[in-house]
UniProtKB/Swiss-Prot annotation:
It comes from Conus textile. The modification 6'-bromotryptophan is found at residues 48, 76. GO terms for cellular component: extracellular region. It is found in: Secreted. Coiled coil: none annotated. This is Conotoxin Gla(1)-TxVI. One of its GO terms (molecular function) is ion channel inhibitor activity. Pfam families: Conotoxin. The presence of a 'disulfide through disulfide knot' structurally defines this protein as a knottin. Expressed by the venom duct. The lineage of its organism: Eukaryota, Metazoa, Spiralia, Lophotrochozoa, Mollusca. Disulfide bonds join 51-65, 58-69, 64-73. The keyword Signal applies. Residues 1-19 form the signal peptide. It comes from the Eukaryota.
Length: 76
């Protein structure tokens, strides 16, 4: 009976350890996905933030990173 109790305790510890490891893996995957999404969003915003890069159509100079709009943003 004593051996059975020890065996059950060991099994419970192993199962709880496995559950903790699996949860940590899920969080790590979510962190990777969030990191990649943030990088994609930054690339969509343009090199300098919330402005348009060179050769992108614009209506006002404030839309361009270079603050120079002549129908399209100039590079510098």
């Amino acid at each position: 009976m004593e051996k059975l109790t020890i065996l059950l305790l060991v099994a419970a510890v192993l199962m709880s350890t496995q559950a903790l490891v699996e949860r940590a893996g899920e969080n790590h995957s979510k962190e990777n996905i969030n990191f990649l999404l943030k990088r994609k969003r930054a690339a969509d915003r343009g090199m300098w933030g919330e402005c348009k890069d060179g050769l992108t159509t614009c209506l006002a100079p404030s839309e361009c990173c270079s603050e120079d709009c002549e129908g399209s943003c100039t590079m510098w």
